[in-house]
Every structure is written in structure tokens, then in C-alpha cells.
Regions:
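Structural signature of cysteine-dependent C-C bond-forming condensing enzymes
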Residues: 1-14, 22-76, 86-88
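Short beta-strand scaffold segments in enzyme catalytic cores
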Residues: 81-84
Length: 88
């Protein structure tokens, strides 16, 4: 993506593992972030693996102009889900 890399964040650090509800809660949080026009920071992030240094990850919440978000969830037993959401 180069300079156009989409912002990256994570919610699990703040909500813990909610077992079956995790994916649904993260989808709601992604929609709320879109509604507010922000990308939530990851304040517990101490360092970034050098292999991912080009990704726009931040400890601080920052403004963002987007109407779409990609929510990725993984479950036990190899279950994976990708949900692309758009703000109304």
C-alpha cells in the first residue's frame, strides 16, 4: 500500500476475549469508530515488530476519513470471518 496503507487498530486489548460475542462486539466498535470519524489507538502497544513498521498503527486515537472498515475475527477450531462494514 505504501503511503496509502489503511490505518490498523485492535479492540481485544480493551474488551478481552468474549468467546462467541467477540466478533459481533468488534463489528459494533468498528461501526462506532466510523460514525465518530476516528481510528482508536492501541495504548498498550509497546513496540511494533520491524516487519510491520510500515503499517499505520498508533498508541493514540486519531482522526480518519473513511466510511468502510474491515473486521477480522478468528474463532476456535480454525473458524475465520471477514466482515466489511460501511457507515450509514
Amino acid at each position: 500500500f505504501g503511503a496509502d496503507a489503511p490505518p490498523v487498530t485492535a479492540f481485544k486489548w480493551s474488551i478481552g476475549h468474549l468467546i462467541a460475542a467477540a466478533g459481533a462486539i468488534e463489528a459494533v466498535l468498528a461501526l462506532e469508530a466510523l460514525r465518530r470519524g476516528v481510528v482508536p489507538g492501541i495504548p498498550v502497544l509497546d513496540r511494533i515488530d520491524p516487519a510491520f513498521a510500515a503499517l499505520p498503527v498508533s498508541r493514540e486515537t486519531r482522526k480518519a476519513r473513511s466510511d468502510v472498515a474491515l473486521v477480522l475475527s478468528r474463532g476456535f477450531g480454525g473458524t475465520d470471518c471477514a466482515l466489511l462494514v460501511r457507515a450509514a
